[in-house]
């Protein structure tokens, strides 16, 4: 056990985490040269294209150090995005040390900060690695100072590398062996293992990634999940090198995978403790919590026939990702679809993109919504994320909405614009400080989650030319003035456009969507009224004027009463059409109307 090192790589998006993992695998001959592809641990196409890591991955490497000893290095590649922060915290709980990778041309960013604090909470030994030192804009000395001032850890012995060219990779491996502690654990104690991640394999069923803290996992053993007391028999045990290699057992300190004929990923919750049925451990490992969706939206297929394919696609994705939820719903305007819950906006985008790309579906997504807590006059408390479930305003006592604490790091030339953005989004400033002697400001703001889930991140990036970074966590629910905004077309409500908004935003949003619908809905033979309403009150209106058909064109001369008679007949016909005619709203109009304006 003294020769085992378990470590994670912490980095902000794009600072070179997956590339460093590639170089470490190459250096330790984990794969032959012909099998190497860039970002080997990012197994989904979408992970490679967006340059993000979504699922936690692991790899076991054998390394012969300069002292002549053979070491077993277990590397955990963790997600870097705020939506997947719980996965990060569980991966970190399975390790004793971390490599903090910082881009030496960009410096420390907000998500790096959040993940480093998680590592410190897990008592990690941290090695600072400055990447991209071969870039002309690299300034390692300045970044070392920044790491010391912002994070408060010693960066004097930072390892300077370029993951792209392979410079300094050997130094990283030596630092891991020399500075990171070996795992603690007792092979003879009752089994205690942490569930780090799980995914679905077509042949093996659910594959579980585990780190054994105490005891030994053996093939054929009956195990218990401590969160729900479900029992299973282990079929296979192995490690990733990054290829699957069956080993038959894992003992204290080791990281590997097990399969146990599980049918669904939902049965194995990340962070759960696994123990033996015959000789269980006395208590579960700390830190486990259920992950709940934060952002909701409805997804509808363009073609009604695709509904069953959408259900199958969602079920397949759910096998690998139990953190998103879905349930069937119907809309008068868009037909059959699903109400889905996600961990955040990136999670929503990734799932939607995978549905469209991997399953070849054309989809419409409604405006994202968060969970509001509604207390009715009868004292009942409801959690509501779908506008159609909102009770009548006369029955509502109070509505509370989720607020977050956001940490924003931004160069000071963009500070004014970022402060304006936060104020515009109903933010309350908690703290503003400068990082050491740098020109980077550290902002702490309280913001309503509903204002952040739309396009806050995109606006933040565009205002700051990409230099600002954001990290957030939900802090509390606060009483707020929330309204349900409905849209009526010729007096008929259109459920797909309804949304839940803050009172101060209702009129502006109502006017925007009415104006957009006016441009998108084709003209008819009669007048069309587009209205936005809150409660029973109309707050915005647009009118689409009808075509004018010249019914008197065929007249030549003759009595004026003939002309009046034809116009009167046309008027009656239009009135009848208006009372029985349904306005045909093209699918495209919904998609365009639901796009959030700047």
From Swiss-Prot:
One of its GO terms (molecular function) is ribosome binding. Transmembrane segments: none annotated. Its EC number is 3.6.5.n1. Gene3D superfamilies: 3.30.70.240, Elongation factor 4, C-terminal domain (3.30.70.2570), Elongation Factor G (Translational Gtpase), domain 3 (3.30.70.870), P-loop containing nucleotide triphosphate hydrolases (3.40.50.300), Translation factors (2.40.30.10). Belongs to the TRAFAC class translation factor GTPase superfamily. Classic translation factor GTPase family. LepA subfamily. This is Elongation factor 4. It catalyses: GTP + H2O = GDP + phosphate + H(+). Required for accurate and efficient protein synthesis under certain stress conditions. May act as a fidelity factor of the translation reaction, by catalyzing a one-codon backward translocation of tRNAs on improperly translocated ribosomes. Back-translocation proceeds from a post-translocation (POST) complex to a pre-translocation (PRE) complex, thus giving elongation factor G a second chance to translocate the tRNAs correctly. Binds to ribosomes in a GTP-dependent manner. Keywords: Cell membrane, GTP-binding, Hydrolase, Membrane, Nucleotide-binding, Protein biosynthesis. The gene is lepA. It is a peripheral membrane protein. It comes from Wolbachia pipientis wMel. It is found in: Cell membrane. It comes from the Bacteria. GO terms for cellular component: plasma membrane. GO terms for biological process: positive regulation of translation. Pfam families: EFG_C (PF00679), EFG_III (PF14492), GTP_EFTU (PF00009), GTP_EFTU_D2 (PF03144), LepA_C (PF06421).
